[in-house]
């Protein structure tokens, strides 16, 4: 089973215990009790132990020592999977948050361990095996229609995340009949149609994305920004991001270096397509290599990686746009992919359960 789903939300007491242990590196029951009493969250041993046990069960801390020498530490995990409660984190404004990384962290490549646990990978692979078995039994005409449906819904949601105001129905009419909706800017239609072009290109060349290179990534980006007055190729000027103090690299040479490191890491260090997909999706957003269209490129590139491994691509249809943006900002500011990973798993479950049936 996958641990710590968002519906299993930590209580205020549990969050405070976790932060106390993180801050102090280790803590005994007595120290935890004293801390809880100091912030008016209970002082009894039972209260402290209940909170500690919940954190152990969630896989966030571990018990060390024996008898009176028992203490607790944050469970050894990479910075890449550090736990943050999104609701609590985003109660503060960008200037109030404790942002660890205001600039690009080249050390991130040293902090990435196993992205998915063995049980998570087993569950994802089992879901995909079910999808693969179903698709074998479907006639080509149905497979074609399902990919068309997924294309419409991915184009709609990915564009919506970027502020596009087309409805799902209007998006379907635009893609299938090439009819633009009234009351919308031409650029919105172009953005949506470009998603279709990019996904068509990926579907036709899916095996080419088993090993990534800069040209393939630039090709996907070029298709997504065609006709939108966006320069193609790596950007040569600084960009800012709304809602965060994080500022991406502003030097073309460092941008290229970061992209090369990302590509090398993805190709040589990540053996399963799920890990490779989530890594590339986040890193393209983090590096912001292009003048515009970075997150669109990241979502399509992640799907290209999945398709190259014969894995069902994501439509993102049911994702909450605010959650998506929060997960990406958490990665910018803390280099933690944990919340984004939860969303990824949820979306994979959704797509396997709703397409190619």
Language model regions located:
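FIC/Doc superfamily catalytic core
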Residues: 1-357
